[in-house]
Amino acid sequence: MWVKICGLQFMKDAVAAVEAGADALGFVFAPSRRQVTPERVEALISGLPPETVTVGVFVDAPMEEIRRAVTLSGLKAVQLHGSEPPEAIDQIGLPVIKAIRIRGPEDLARLPDYRNAAGLLLEPYVEGQAGGTGQTLDPTLVRWAAQTLERAGVPLAGPDEPLTPGRPKLILAGGLTPDNVADAIARAQPGGVDVSSGVENGGVKDINKIYAFVAAAKGVAR
């Protein structure tokens, strides 16, 4: 199972995520309590293995701001977590994860518009919040999302495949913890999972929870 640990700010946590076996590390550039600067991320990335998949998270940021952050920090991928249009995916030049906030089945129809993405991160819609809500998504909606994309002729990446543009990976996010991620994977059958607050204590990353989350996610038999 592909696992992304998001909202990293400190070297010890990033190193722990890599050592635990996470497939991708997320750094939030959008205004939030987890926000980091391009310079800070460059310093963090410099201490990680060169093959580490590092993802910058942006919310409705100008394209020039995204490109500047990518250039300064050395990111390997970008996550668009706002209301960015499908054409934004082709303007970045890196694999793109597009976050989609889901209210219900009616929101699934627009997923094929983002067919050029490397990942589609599905999370529950919460008014006024772009991610980090701690709310869980109905697993049925993830399975329906896969069916919607398959009917539209969009090939999907499996849980053991890397981020590949044009072959989006369905990534489950929202309310996941070391205690519930295995059950969530079994029920939703996603191509990956993403966690931030679920591996924290009091808003601070907990290394033991990072290890436990990755182990639980990757221990699920499919």
From Swiss-Prot:
Pathway: Amino-acid biosynthesis; L-tryptophan biosynthesis; L-tryptophan from chorismate: step 3/5. This is N-(5'-phosphoribosyl)anthranilate isomerase. Belongs to the TrpF family. Disulfide bonds: none annotated. It comes from the Bacteria. InterPro entries: Aldolase_TIM (IPR013785), PRAI_dom (IPR001240), RibuloseP-bd_barrel (IPR011060), TrpF_fam (IPR044643). One of its GO terms (biological process) is L-tryptophan biosynthetic process. Its EC number is 5.3.1.24. It catalyses: N-(5-phospho-beta-D-ribosyl)anthranilate = 1-(2-carboxyphenylamino)-1-deoxy-D-ribulose 5-phosphate.
